[in-house]
Amino acid sequence: MDTVSIQVIARMRSDFATKFGIPRQSGLVESLRSTIVFEPEFRNPDALRGIEDFSHLWIIWQFSEAVRQGWSPTVRPPRLGGNTRMGVFATRSPFRPNNLGLSSIRLLGVEQTREFGTVLHVGGADLMDGTPIFDIKPYIPYGDCHTDATGGFTDTAGDFLLNVSFPPALLSLLPEDKRDAAIGVLSHDPRPSYQRSPERVYGLSFAGYDIRFTVKENVLTVREVLKK
């Protein structure tokens, strides 16, 4: 089998310390804020010349938490309730031969920093903190937007959105600039498809806080917010 080597050019800095709760697709929670920090050998600002003229980017990255688990020819997509198997190449499962992810994200700004050189501030990313990034490309509407596209099983899959009950006293414990994103993440039902007990208390690690919640029917209720 042929093999190739590939370099990590950057890492994502995000509010997700673990993979639990990360949106299942990029762009679902636009209020999420993250930063792309380049590795030292790729901090030449010339490599980013002109990138500020694009509103969105494609990033190619590694499902680093799935590498140890290998790949499977069939997987159970969460949007099908975790009960139906589909071919891995017909899904976006992390359990792939090369563990590569592809995300479309919004470019919010380009900043020159003293410590890390030029960094990219982005919105709507679905990556864990520290995720390795292999490449960045501009999103080009005339070539990347297919108005006649069909979405396979995702076109008919159910809506996983939940109503979030976040008591004001608990919400106020989060930094103001993280509140909308936290609610957005919770509304997309972070629970695994195989864990849906209304009695279970779940914990979401987000932005340095442990957000504990329960779910009954279609309502997610936050029970506790703890600073880590």
Name each region found by the language model:
Residues M1-L100, Q112-K228:
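Mixed-charge, low-complexity intrinsically disordered regions
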Residues R13, I105-L108:
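Conserved positions in beta-strands of structured domains
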